[in-house]
Every structure is written in structure tokens, then in C-alpha cells.
Amino acid sequence: MSAVGLPLWRQHAHALWQLSKPRVVALIVFCAVIGMFLASPGVPDAAVVVPATLGIALVAGAAAMVNCLVERGVDVRMRRTAWRATATGEVGARETLLVALAVGGMGLALLLACCNALTAWLTLGTFVGYAIVYTLLLKPNTPQNIVIGGASGAMPPVLGWTAVNGQIDAFALALFLIIYTWTPPHFWALALYRRDDYARAGLPMLPVTHGQRYTTLSIVLYGFLLTAVTLLPVALGEAGAIYLGAVLLLDGRLLFLAVRLHRQYADALARRLFAWSIWYLTWLFAALLLDHYYLIPLN
């Protein structure tokens, strides 16, 4: 959404809002909320769900702002990110940092006051893992950046889970592993059709360092691994026929696109796989939620 034509203060507020990567935060919050509902045999208490959702969203937005701040020099060299306010100079480094710290601090305070210390500490760890470890240390230095750094992005359902019951169970770890395994092929698909952008910016993404063929093969292999990991909720007895049917269809489609991409590469196919992977995760977690309340046993 363009902010052109708005008063200057609203344009500035819009620029700050965009630095928080609202679309990414929306998916993070969605997975966290699903984790909250899965952690409860009934409907979780709204007095926990509302502040937990807001707290996680605020910290996620703050982490995204720090990411944009740290990468402003890189963003200038990439067509995909050159418009960001930190790259154009519309929002200064000091202001970005202060707003991020204020927003993140409010989120953590909310989690500590209305949820529990475990969730607050895990959320802080996730912030540090993404904004500092991934952004500063991993992304500019290793093609395995997304494999190692993906742990931070896989935390939302665990944060939602602990917000409700204050502990980490096997099912919560299974949710973590699903997103952790999903993350590399999701981002590698993006990096494939944006490889020139990443090369121009000097970022060692897998398609830049190892080439297209190696990357598409890696996507296929991770696709098969993801298929196995998504069966964990069934193996743990936490999901039934609804989820199993959904996950077989979703994994089948993902593998079909991955294999096709490997056999006859085209940027358009990589784009399609990237877009599908977002819907894949959304529908998979929606199926988990539906199955949770309308469980159809497999035996």
C-alpha cells in the first residue's frame, strides 16, 4: 500500500510500519496462535491469548526492524529491498533502533506480565537469534545461514504453546521441527529467482555459492525430509485423519513442484514454489487446528 498523498507524519509512520515486515509478522502470529489453541484441550483463556498474541507480534516486528537496520547497506544494492526506509534514509538508524527497542520492550513486558517468564525468555532468545545471530553473523557469512538461523523462525508455535501451559512438550517440539524443516526450501526458492539480487549484494545464499542445480536438489531432499517430519503429530497421537489427509495432499503438491523445479528449472517455477510454500504452511497449521477440535482417530 502506497503512502503517497498522506500527511508527512502518516507517511513516516507508514515507513516505520513497513520496516516491521507486517506480512511476515502476520504468518508468525498465525503460527503462534495455532500453538496456543493446540496447547489447550478446550479454548484457551482470552486473558492469555490476547496479550500473548500482541506481545509476540511486537517482538517479531521489533526484530524485523533491527534486521532492516543492520542490512540497510545491503538493501540498497537489492531491487527487492532498495525501497525500505532504512535503505533510502527516510528513517534514520538511531530512530529505527530506538523504536525497535521500545516496541520489543513493550512486547516482552506484556509477555512477562500476562503470560509467564518462560515465554518471555524464549521470545527474547528468538529476537536475539534472528536480529543478531542470523542477521549479523550467519546471513553474510555462510550459505547455510537459513539452515542454522531457521531455528529462530521456527519458534512461534512453541511460544504460543508455552504462553498457554508454561512448558514445552513433545508436540510443541514437533511443531518447531515442521517449521524448521520447511524454512530452507521456502527461502531457497526465493533465493533462486532472486539470485542476481543476492549476488549483487554479496550475500552467500545457496544459489549464489553452489549454483542452481545443487539448490534445487537440496529443495527436493528437504521436501522429502519435510514429508517425514510433518507426520510426527500423527506418530505422537496428537493428530488424526483430518490432518493426515491434509498433510498428504500438501506434501504431495510440494514434492511435485520441487521435483519439477529440479528437472526443468525456470524462475517462474521457483516463484510458484515460493508462493505455494507459504500457503502450504498456512493450510497445514489450519488442518492441525481443525483436527485438534474434530479429531477422527486413525484406529
UniProtKB/Swiss-Prot annotation:
InterPro entries: Protohaem_IX_farnesylTrfase, UbiA_prenyltransferase, UbiA_sf. It is found in: Cell inner membrane. One of its GO terms (biological process) is heme O biosynthetic process. Disulfide bonds: none annotated. It is an enzyme of class 2 (transferase). It catalyses: heme b + (2E,6E)-farnesyl diphosphate + H2O = Fe(II)-heme o + diphosphate. Keywords: Cell inner membrane, Cell membrane, Heme biosynthesis, Membrane, Transferase, Transmembrane, Transmembrane helix. Its main location: membrane. Belongs to the UbiA prenyltransferase family. Protoheme IX farnesyltransferase subfamily. This is Protoheme IX farnesyltransferase 1. The lineage of its organism: Bacteria, Pseudomonadati, Pseudomonadota, Betaproteobacteria, Neisseriales.
